[in-house]
Amino acid sequence: MHLPSITAGYLAVLALLYAGLAIQVLRLRRGYRVLFGDGDNIKLRSAIRAHANFAEYVPIIALMVAMLEMSGMSAMRVHLLMAALLLARLLHPLGMYVGPRSWQFHICRVGGIALTVTVLIAAALLILSRLAAGIS
């Protein structure tokens, strides 16, 4: 068993993205003078949800990919999963700040969450298949 250094590298970049999302929420809270909730402000609500959505998906996916990497999955597959996650998490918040009828909404928000869920399912199925095959 080895340390999941590939996953760790991507996690460092994802952590910076997460910090950027948090800073955006703080900036909007200060600008709109809203301490709790979203103050019925659509921009603040979008920023809060982009930040929360990241926190809802990234930890479990990163944990699963780290486990796959530690179990000896090929470096190329680890890079593929983590690069897809990074792309998805870059796209999703961009789509949160545009109108729902725009092409940016469909490509960024819808595409970002679709790619996120695809990586989530792929990582889960890879773990299950490795367990079924007796690979630990």
Question: Each predicted region: which residue ranges?
Answer:
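Core segments of transmembrane alpha-helices
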Residues: N53-V65, L120-I121
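Transmembrane alpha-helical segments that form the membrane-embedded catalytic/substrate-channel core
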Residues: V13-R30, L86-M96
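Alpha-helical transmembrane segments
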Residues: L3-G20, A75-A83
